[in-house]
Design a protein with these regions (language model features):
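ATP-hydrolysis module of ASCE/P-loop NTPase motor domains
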Residues: 46-49, 67-156, 179, 254-261, ...
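Proline-centered turn/helix-capping motifs that create local helix->coil transitions or kinks
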Residues: 114-120, 206-210, 274-286
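Short glycine-/polar-rich loops that comprise or flank the Walker A/P-loop
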Residues: 16-20, 45-48, 83-86, 217-220, ...
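Alpha-helical scaffold elements adjacent to nucleotide-binding pockets in ATP/GTP-utilizing enzyme cores
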Residues: 6, 33-41, 57-64, 86-89, ...
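Conserved nucleotide-binding/hydrolysis micro-motifs of P-loop NTPases
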Residues: 28-31, 55-58, 112, 227-231, ...
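P-loop NTPase Walker
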Residues: 1-73, 77-78, 149, 173, ...
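Conserved helicase NTPase motor core
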Residues: 1-3, 22-23, 30-31, 50, ...
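Helicase P-loop NTPase motor core
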Residues: 1, 7, 66, 250-253, ...
């Protein structure tokens, strides 16, 4: 809702051209809902905007300019099923022990490399332990097979787009000139590659200038996020992206949205007490105007089974109350 209203404000109040807006969220469903809301607010002009996921935005960039790397613009995109099938072949041909190196574990390792913008050559150079060397070798084999198939996997989409913008300043400047307003949702869930993409489009200190062309002023960047809600570290998300935002983008202004519209004050007071123990966070106190609500009940379970049974019983009781 915050991003949607911001976009509507840009177009209707500041007369921003819709085609200069890039809005990024994390799921196709969220992107579709955002597009619908913006169209409702500002009309069909909103269709000129790029409102998409990181992956979809990168696909559009790559379809235009990936041939700079000698890759066909009609490249295929491997989804998770395709990628797993290919990695299974890699693991089989490298005779990896499936118990020690399950296919999914190898895929996760390769995904982590790509999310950190580490190519297979660097992965091999930096591999210090036997498992790291195994993952680096699998990465190299996997990547060579992708190239032979004229394909990119999901992680390649973002990594390759970042490398493209870094390697060819004229391509980067083209998109910096087009997207004068960049908005990113759930910024606390971004990984290093996604962070790097945002910097290439918006930062004022990017390397490389197109000869004979003045450096484009950084785009106006707005991100929405909450460091207290960062839960995707296991997928490569780094909380430092939002914690260091003001240092990464000097002059940024932080607006704290501390009113909660879903929970009662008793719940929020407990949440405030728990989260206050986190280190290095911006202090905020969530509040609500929907009342104190019922007191929180604590229950100690003896086992995971007891815990699950308690939850099931509570849900069953609530359902009975609703139907009564």
């Amino acid at each position: 809702r915050v991003l949607t209203r911001r976009i509507a404000h840009l177009v209707s109040q500041r007369d921003v051209h819709p085609g200069s807006v890039l809005a990024i969220t994390f799921t196709n469903k969220a992107a579709a809902e955002m597009r619908e809301r913006v169209v409702e607010l500002v009309g069909n002009r909103a269709k000129l905007m790029w409102v998409s996921t990181f992956h979809s935005a990168c696909v559009r960039i790559l379809r235009q300019d990936i041939d700079r790397f000698g890759i066909t613009k009609t490249f295929s995109i491997y989804d998770d099923t395709d990628a797993k099938r290919l990695m299974s072949l890699v693991c089989r041909d490298q005779e990896l022990d499936p118990k020690r190196y399950p296919v999914r574990a190898v895929m996760n390792a390769v995904s982590n490399f790509k999310n950190e913008l580490i190519d297979y050559e660097r992965a091999a150079l930096e591999a210090a332990s036997p498992p790291q060397k195994v993952y680096a070798a699998a990465y190299a084999d996997y990547q060579s097979r992708l190239v032979a198939a004229h394909a990119l996997d999901f992680d390649d989409l973002i990594m390759t787009a970042v490398h493209l913008l870094q390697a060819f300043p004229d391509v980067r400047e083209k998109y910096r000139r087009r997207f004068r307003h960049v908005l990113v949702d759930e910024y606390q869930d971004t990984n290093h590659a996604q962070y790097a993409l945002v910097r290439e489009l918006c930062a004022g200190d990017v390397a490389g200038v197109v000869e004979g062309s003045p450096l484009v002023e950084p785009a106006e960047l707005m991100v929405v996020g909450d460091s207290d809600q960062s839960i995707y570290a296991f997928r490569g998300a780094t909380i430092r992206n939002i914690m260091d935002f003001e240092a990464d983008f000097p002059g940024a202004r932080t607006v704290v949205l501390d009113q909660n519209y879903r929970s009662t004050q008793n719940v929020l007071t407990a949440a405030n007490s728990v989260i206050a123990r986190n280190e290095g966070r911006r202090d905020k106190r969530l509040w609500s105007d929907i009342g104190e609500g019922e007191l929180i009940v604590g229950w100690g379970a003896d086992s995971e089974t007891d815990d699950a049974q308690f939850v099931a019983d509570e849900l069953e009781q609530l359902l009975h109350q609703i139907h009564e």
